[in-house]
Amino acid sequence: MEARAGLAMQSRAAVGVGAGPGVGRRGRAVIRVGKRPTAASLRVGGPAGPAAAKPLAPLYCLKASRGHDSLHNSVDEALLLKRKSEEVLFYLNGRCIYLVGMMGSGKSTVAKILAEVLGYSFFDSDKLVEQAVGMPSVAQIFKEHSEAFFRDNESSVLRDLSSMRRLVVATGGGAVIRPVNWKYMKKGLSVWLDVPLDALARRIAQVGTASRPLLDQPSSDPYTAAFSKLSMLAEQRGDAYANADARVSLEEIAAKQGHDDVSKLTPTDIAIEALLKIENFVTEHSTSSGPVGDLIVDSQNRRTKAL
């Protein structure tokens, strides 16, 4: 029997680092299946009111070269991330952000960074499905039920999340294959993390495939097995990922920074690029009709009143 997931969030103040819009909060998401609720404590960002949403002047500085002190680079990255998040936040108007991409592409890691700097809440749709059906892993859900059962519950979770605001959601790798899921995600902004298959296969081979049911198969060469299966999945899902509002290519980021390997990129590098792509998307659609165009017009009206 399909489990139906209902989401309810209750926030309460907690001790954070610093003060003002960046102060952290603790949130609680309650997933109810039938009559048995399961509670999970989630780390979320702090609120961002009109003052926090007002963008700063565009930032055109470049990060320090990789030859400089690593601490200097970290400070540069943090400042750029903060400045860019404040610019993007002004135009989001509370709309959710959905990260899509292949398994192992870093969606959860990048989503947490984006949620922190935007003052949004973070959710992992796979974790919510696990809580909804009362099982510890996606692999076990596939084993004891089926992929179709998992996909049904995944759609239910995305449906419930789509009714909320100010979320960054890391979706499962296969969430894009169902058109109804795009209906839910299009209520917000979707970002595709496009990672080369070779890099994905190396990552997955290092950590193992036990938690990834579509890849878990006996093999004397984990890399070859992972690359083969990932290639097949990419062929099946490539067009679906391209439906995203913005594409973040790790190869392009690496090339701009002079790297020959995407593994040299930091999650912050990727998060900054995601914010740039989101900003490009919303500004390019500022004159269009529909939800995104209405979003920009409303943001521009609020900015005019604030001046």
Curated annotation (Swiss-Prot):
Induction: By chitin oligosaccharide elicitor. Binds 1 Mg(2+) ion per subunit. Keywords: Amino-acid biosynthesis, Aromatic amino acid biosynthesis, ATP-binding, Chloroplast, Kinase, Magnesium, Metal-binding, Nucleotide-binding, Plastid, Transferase, Transit peptide. It is found in: Plastid, Chloroplast. Disulfide bonds: none annotated. Residues 285-307 are annotated as: Disordered. Substrate binds at residues 126, 151, 173. GO terms for molecular function: ATP binding; metal ion binding; shikimate kinase activity. One of its GO terms (biological process) is amino acid biosynthetic process. GO terms for cellular component: chloroplast; plastid. Residues 1-60 form a transit peptide. InterPro entries: P-loop_NTPase, Shikimate/glucono_kinase, Shikimate_kinase/TSH1, Shikimate_kinase_CS. PANTHER family: SHIKIMATE KINASE, SHIKIMATE KINASE 1, CHLOROPLASTIC. Belongs to the shikimate kinase family. Catalyzes the specific phosphorylation of the 3-hydroxyl group of shikimic acid using ATP as a cosubstrate. This is Shikimate kinase 2, chloroplastic. It comes from Oryza sativa subsp. japonica (Rice).
